[in-house]
């Protein structure tokens, strides 16, 4: 045994001491012949290999690792047994066995268990029939061998080693000879209490082993042998194969021996009680079939222990069911003397973890860890960009995406919000909540979406975001579009594929910047191939709403459905759910046209809009406080999308870039992948490659700016068009350039998108949200505002500034969920032009630094200028988590004040000097954070430097 039992050295003395003491006492009390064996651990019992193994654990050859533990259990059991004799055992306690006749062997389904029937003649002339399993008989013989080494019983027990199937089979081979031997046992052996108990009817299950106090060693041996299946458990109905282990446990329990932990004892009742019952009751055979399940369960315990490298203690627990094993408490573990303190601590910790897991499973039986029944694929938070998990594990997955009419969308909010909120921890309370939510919602949605579920949209997770992966959790929501006939829609594309297929512009991005309590943003991306997006007909039908994703309002995140019309130029409808609180009505732009729509009408518009190519609903929550988006717990999301990235739209000349959609949600978060990249943008997302942004040199369509007060949260749909001139930068930090503001405006205007043309001084105000934006009219694009990305000037410095989606710029850095941190990012490029000029971007200032938000001078600082853009405060965590890199808590120092510092304060954020604004600063842009977390050196576009300090 020692050779096989890693814990032997630890248990050796303790176990030997206990066993020897028990054996000695049992032999002295009831044992006569066994007396010899008792004295010597190895010496007395050497004749009986089984006994030898067991009693002299040190010497014991390896019967099996489990044996040692079993022995220990037996030892405790023995103590129990010792007490048993004292207890009334029925007539058998007074009578002895006169003769044993073997009636026959019967094989049960489980061949491992052969039942042996005996007819026992008692000294009182009574005859009883006893049926024992082969394992019990083997154990019994092994015990006798231990008690009566001179009888050479070991010959009859080819393998006393243990419960191993191999050994059991061997036992069966020689079982006959053993049984025959039992019939011819000498009277002094038959009179032994152990024999009496074994043959007492109640004992059949376990009695035989535990009963004989005098023969504890025998019972131990039996247990060790694997006969252990024996009845103690048997009485309890425990399969005999297990029962051996169980009975071991029971004995200990009964005996209060160190092994009380054996749950079997508990389950059976005290081992003693069992024995008593066994004595009184006719022998009960454990159906082998019962044993099998237990065996499997035991294997489960063994495997579990093996993972913890504690399998050497398996014998201590093998009599326990997995349920009982997992329910062991610290107190229970302390009762196991054979466990070391380290093992107890380890087990305690692991058992607690297991309990928590099981509780979680119970709570969320329907939610698999990664893919909830709702079909939301949870990407465990990992910073790395991994293959996208297909959101659609099942139709349920589609549920996650509300393709339904808007009214159905609401139910989704809860789940999506949960998901988004749980971005940081894929599993956790949130996960539980989600699962419960998802289960209900799934049911609800499944019904709702059965039709739409026909086609599941692949959900692409742009893991690229994960780069900042501070918010590793990306939620991929499978999108179902009935209309989507494109088979490709059904197959989730790996993020790489997404990026690769720029044509798939119709990526649904669910970007929820959830600055949920965690202040982390989850990026939910729903992408489907363009075709998978609603077909034009559907859009025309107004099915768009169905295809459109509903934004989780609770998070105030915007969900963008970019349903690029299959035709590249088809204008995209942008609906921004302004924060409900915001006074501004959402602006919907169709291509060049802009409509002002009240938030309340958004749903309607979505439905009615023939081309719901892009539907953005921002939950008002983010802008909940129209006046200060910054304060809003959840920043709105700003998205730049080109519905179809037709090159044409890219053409700077086009006034309307129907394909390009810019959605600004007050807290501006741009899904990096979604953001359009300037052709130059190194960061450009491959997926977005089609985006015209890069090509466009002009500002965005003025219409995006139409709402003079960008304050209105409504997102403006900015079509990328080159704006011939940039409005003169206004001193106010407000976005001066519409195009830029259109990009950033949402972020810039607190909750409101800064759609207001730069010319409107109100831009500053728009930050406040306080001013309702003027209904955006398809105002002609204000003169293109080319802001110097390097210095933030309106272009007077001579460096060419191209309005570029700054987001593109940042996206990379913030590939993480909080892709667009510009709200937080005070990158000069952002600041200076609000967007990095494509050149600059290309120029290699990898991340433009936002200049002082004030650079209202046409600097598209919209991000900065709409300090709200920097409504970063709420987003800071988000950003920090996401981009860890850029986290600038101060972010645009004034970003918190949606009204960024205005002209009153002329200090330059960038260089710290006073008398000029950062937008006019000639120094490289520096982070606005006062803390000066870092200074980004932004190379002027002329210099093509891709690195940022």
Curated annotation (Swiss-Prot):
Compositionally biased intervals (Gly residues): 28-43
Presence of keyword Iron: no
Region spans: Disordered: 25-44, 59-92, 200-221, 236-262, 355-457, 739-779
Zn finger region (CCHC-type): 906-923
GO molecular function: nucleic acid binding; phosphatidylinositol binding; zinc ion binding
Presence of the UniProt keyword Ribonucleoprotein in the record: no
Biased composition (Low complexity): 200-219, 416-425
Bias type Polar residues, positions: 61-78
SMART domains found in the cross-reference section: ZnF_C2HC
Chain intervals with Basic and acidic residues compositional bias: 395-411, 431-457
UniProt keyword list: Metal-binding, Zinc, Zinc-finger
InterPro entries: PX_dom_sf, SAM, SAM/pointed_sf, ZCCH14_SAM, ZCCHC14, Znf_CCHC, Znf_CCHC_sf
PANTHER family (alphabetical): ZINC FINGER CCHC DOMAIN CONTAINING PROTEIN, ZINC FINGER CCHC DOMAIN-CONTAINING PROTEIN 14
UniProt protein name: Zinc finger CCHC domain-containing protein 14
Source organism of this protein record: Homo sapiens
Gene: ZCCHC14
């Amino acid at each position: 045994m020692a050779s096989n039992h890693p814990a032997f050295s630890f248990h050796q003395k303790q176990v030997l001491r206990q066993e020897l003491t028990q054996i000695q006492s049992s032999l002295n009390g009831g044992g006569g012949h066994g007396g010899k064996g008792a004295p010597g651990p190895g010496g007395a019992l050497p004749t009986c290999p089984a006994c030898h193994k067991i009693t002299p654990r040190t010497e014991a050859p390896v019967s099996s690792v489990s044996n040692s533990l079993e022995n220990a259990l037996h030892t405790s059991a023995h103590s129990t047994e010792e007490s048993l004799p004292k207890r009334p055992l029925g007539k058998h306690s007074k009578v002895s066995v006169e003769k044993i006749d073997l009636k026959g062997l019967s094989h049960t389904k489980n061949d491992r268990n052969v039942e042996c029937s005996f007819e026992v003649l008692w000294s009182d002339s009574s005859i009883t029939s006893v049926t024992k399993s082969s394992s019990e008989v083997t154990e019994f013989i092994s015990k006798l061998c231990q008690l009566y080494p001179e009888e050479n019983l070991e010959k009859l027990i080819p393998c006393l080693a243990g419960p191993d199937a191999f050994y059991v089979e061997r036992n069966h081979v020689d079982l006959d000879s053993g049984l025959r031997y039992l019939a011819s046992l000498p009277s002094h052996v038959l009179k032994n209490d152990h024999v009496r108990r074994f043959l007492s009817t109640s004992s059949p299950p376990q009695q035989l082993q535990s009963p004989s106090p005098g023969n504890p060693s025998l019972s131990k041996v039996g247990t060790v042998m694997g006969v252990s299946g024996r009845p103690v458990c048997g009485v309890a109905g425990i399969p005999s194969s297990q029962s051996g282990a169980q009975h071991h446990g029971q004995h200990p329990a009964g005996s209060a021996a160190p092994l009380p932990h054996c749950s079997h004892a508990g389950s059976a009742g005290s081992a003693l009680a069992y024995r008593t019952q066994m004595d009184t009751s006719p022998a009960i055979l454990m159906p082998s079939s019962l044993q099998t399940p237990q065996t499997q369960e035991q294997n489960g315990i063994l495997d579990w222990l093996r993972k913890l490298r504690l399998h050497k203690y398996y014998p201590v627990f093998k009599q326990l069911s997995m349920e009982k094993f997992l329910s062991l408490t610290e107190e229970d573990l302390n009762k196991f003397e054979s466990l070391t303190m380290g093992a107890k601590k380890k087990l305690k910790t692991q058992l607690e973890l297991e309990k928590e897991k099981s509780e979680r499973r119970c709570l969320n039986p329907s939610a698999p860890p990664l893919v909830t029944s709702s079909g939301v694929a949870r990407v465990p938070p990992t910073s790395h960009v991994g293959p996208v998990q297909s959101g659609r594990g099942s139709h349920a997955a589609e549920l996650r995406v509300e393709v339904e009419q808007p009214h159905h969308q609401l139910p989704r909010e809860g789940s999506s919000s949960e998901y988004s909120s749980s971005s940081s921890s894929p599993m956790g309370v949130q996960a539980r909540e989600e699962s419960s939510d998802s289960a209900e919602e799934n049911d609800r949605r499944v019904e709702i979406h059965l039709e739409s579920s026909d086609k599941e949209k692949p959900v692409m997770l742009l893991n690229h975001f994960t780069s900042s992966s501070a918010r590793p959790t990306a939620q991929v929501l499978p999108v179902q579009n009935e209309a989507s006939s494109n088979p490709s829609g059904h197959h989730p594309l790996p993020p790489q594929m997404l990026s690769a297929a720029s044509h798939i512009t119709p990526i649904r991005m669910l970007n929820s910047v959830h600055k949920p309590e965690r202040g982390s943003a989850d990026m939910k991306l729903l992408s489907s191939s363009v075709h998978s997006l609603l077909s034009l007909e559907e859009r025309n039908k107004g099915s768009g709403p169905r295809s459109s994703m509903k934004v989780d309002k609770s998070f105030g995140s915007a969900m963008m459905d970019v349903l690029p019309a299959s035709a590249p130029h088809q204008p995209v409808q942008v609906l921004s759910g302004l924060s409900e609180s915001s006074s501004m009505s959402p602006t919907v732009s169709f291509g060049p046209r802009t409509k002002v729509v009240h938030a309340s009408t958004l749903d309607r518009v979505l439905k009615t809009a023939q081309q719901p190519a892009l539907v953005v609903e921002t939950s008002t929550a983010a802008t909940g406080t129209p006046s200060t988006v910054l304060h809003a717990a959840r920043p709105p999301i700003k998205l730049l999308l080109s519905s179809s990235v037709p090159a044409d739209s890219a053409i700077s000349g086009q006034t309307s870039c129907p394909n390009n959609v810019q959605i600004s949600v007050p807290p501006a978060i741009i899904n990096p992948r979604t953001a359009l990249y300037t052709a130059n943008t190194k960061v450009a997302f491959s997926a977005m490659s089609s985006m015209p942004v890069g090509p466009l040199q002009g500002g965005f369509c003025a219409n995006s700016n139409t709402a003079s007060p960008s304050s209105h949260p409504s997102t403006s749909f900015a079509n990328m068009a080159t704006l011939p001139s940039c409005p003169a930068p206004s001193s106010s930090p407000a976005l001066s350039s519409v195009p830029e503001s259109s990009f950033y405006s949402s972020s810039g205007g607190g909750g409101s998108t800064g759609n207001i043309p730069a010319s409107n001084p109100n831009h500053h105000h728009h930050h406040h949200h306080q001013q309702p934006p003027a209904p955006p009219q398809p105002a002609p694009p204000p003169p293109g505002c080319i802001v110097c990305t390097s210095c933030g000037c309106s272009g007077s410095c001579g460096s060419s500034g191209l309005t570029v989606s700054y987001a593109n710029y940042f996206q990379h850095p913030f590939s993480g969920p909080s892709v667009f941190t510009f709200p937080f990012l005070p990158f000069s490029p952002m600041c200076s032009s609000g967007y990095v000029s494509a050149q600059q971007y290309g120029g290699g200032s990898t991340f433009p630094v936002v200049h002082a938000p004030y650079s209202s001078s046409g600097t598209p600082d919209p991000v900065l200028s709409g300090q709200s853009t920097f409504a970063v405060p709420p987003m800071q965590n988000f950003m920090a988590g996401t981009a860890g890199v850029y986290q600038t808590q101060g972010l645009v120092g004034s970003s918190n004040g949606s009204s960024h510092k205005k002209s009153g304060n002329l200090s330059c954020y960038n260089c710290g000097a006073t008398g000029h604004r950062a937008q006019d600063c000639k120094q490289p842009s520096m982070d606005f954070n006062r803390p000066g977390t870092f200074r980004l050196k932004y190379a002027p576009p002329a210099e093509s430097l891709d690195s940022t300090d």
